Amino acid sequence: MNQSRIVINTLVAQRAHEEGTSQLAIIKHLLPLGYRNFELRREYFNGNFAELEELAALKLKYRLVYFYSIPENLFVDGHLNIELLQFIAEARLMGANYLKMTLGNFDGHNINELQRLNRLLPDSMQLNLENDQSLANAKISRLVDFFRVANENNVQIGFVNDLGNWVYTKQDEQDATRQLLPYTRYVHLKDYETDNGINTTSFVDSQLDWQKLLKQFAAHLPVALEYPATIDELKNDLNVLNNFVI
């Protein structure tokens, strides 16, 4: 796989975050790996806008690309999330061009709210929705219906296929991938183990047929690693992905 497609989600440094390391410091620690695409997690920020400005400076210095993961629903009580402009402002401040949220309670009748997205979202930003670990936000038929309506109304919004999340909603990842492929702009690659509940793990030596899954996606789509890992584990997994031939 072309290295330029690979994204590192800061969840890989979960332990460092739990020990108080800032997201800025996490990115600086990961830079020597040689990758330039990073997914930043909103829940990892401490509310200090100075950190966002420093991340923007870091982006310019090293020519980084930022993806912004926002653990919030796009639709709340049938309307666009009232914090959406805040999320966009944060993304602008740090220089993130890709936003990720979850669907929320869109019911097909709030078309006017959906169309507002074209006015609110800057042309330089791409908004994508992810299947999380809840059936409310990850039911395949519901997601397909939403993206169909969005397309019919010329609303530019895409899908993030989190391959390791389908197990939480007891849906088949192969079927989900096939049905949502026309809308997919981004992929999260991880696996799960079920020895003690369901836990997120590396895709290497996984229960998922990740090779078969990845071969279904367009060759330019970004692929993010999103699971806790040590630096040595991360290096190994990045090497496996780099050597994967589509």
Question: For the regions a protein language model found, what residue spans apply to each?
Answer:
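Short, electropositive alpha-helical surface patch
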Residues: 56-65, 119-125, 219-220, 235-246
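Active-site acidic/histidine proton-transfer and metal-coordination neighborhood
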Residues: 65, 75-158, 168, 237
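Hydrophobic residues within beta-strands of alpha/beta enzymes
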Residues: 38-39, 99-101, 127, 187, ...
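Generic enzyme active-site microenvironment
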Residues: 37, 128-130, 160-163, 224
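N-terminal pre-domain/capping segments
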Residues: 1-82
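Active-site-proximal loop/turn and secondary-structure-junction residues that shape catalytic pockets
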Residues: 12-14, 42-44, 70-74, 103-107, ...
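Histidine-acidic metal/acid-base catalytic patches
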Residues: 1-31, 89-95, 140-161, 167-246
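Catalytic-core regions built around general acid/base machinery
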Residues: 51-62, 86, 113-120, 145-149, ...
